[in-house]
Amino acid sequence: KRIVDLSGNSDILSILGYQVIGTANSDAYDYTKFPSYLKDTLKGAKILGYSMQDTMDIEAVMNLEPDVIVISTVQEKMYEQLTKIAPTIMIQNEALDWKENIHHMAEIFQRTKQAETWLSAYETKAEKLSQSIKNKYGKDTSYLSFLASGGQFFVFSDAGFGDVLYNDLGLVKPKGMPKQSDISLPVVTYEGLAEIDADYIFLITTDEMQKELESN
């Protein structure tokens, strides 16, 4: 099938054995590029926007002549227009459990076996990595991950990379972490960051922002 994915789940579709022709899995800092970890996976796909945007280039979607279009509820207002181009599936992305998105997509595309195989391999890898990290850095060592953009700091608390760190790898969440209840990452100030007592930090940002933070 010729699949256009605007939902941000092009990586999941690749797990299920599909190569999308159009995607919105673009880099959060530069919508014209793929995230580095998806460059090979999405090679050849046309970037149509960013998955957290509620509108995309309708004409560009049409020119790809898709058989199926996948969107999330973020792009709900585009649904009627897109259905005139090709059958359109609208999904609700799970905010706090990315594995549920895999199960959901697998059910829609009838690829549950592929999903289970991938998740089983992932869990085995996560368990081994968890033990390796704890052996090297200690089982009580805490970790913070946040994204710095536009002078704001978005903390991965209970979803995304935070879910991987604290649930999949079983690493320690530092004291002072903000709570997260939906897809929006909690935003903190410089002072808020200082209140989070972490032993190690994973920083996601641009080179320019990193230099600014290091000089502060």
Identify the residue ranges that each predicted region occupies:
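Solvent-exposed loop/turn segments at secondary-structure junctions
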Residues: 9-11, 26-29, 68, 75-77, ...
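Binding-cleft/active-site segments that stabilize strongly anionic ligands or cofactors
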Residues: 37-90, 137-142, 154-216
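A short, structured surface patch at a secondary-structure boundary
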Residues: 6-60
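Extracytoplasmic/secreted envelope proteins and their assembly/folding machinery
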Residues: 7-10, 14, 58, 76-79, ...
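Short hydrophobic segments within beta-strands
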Residues: 6, 23, 146, 203-204
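Short secondary-structure boundary/hinge segments and terminal tails
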Residues: 30-32, 79, 99-100, 124, ...
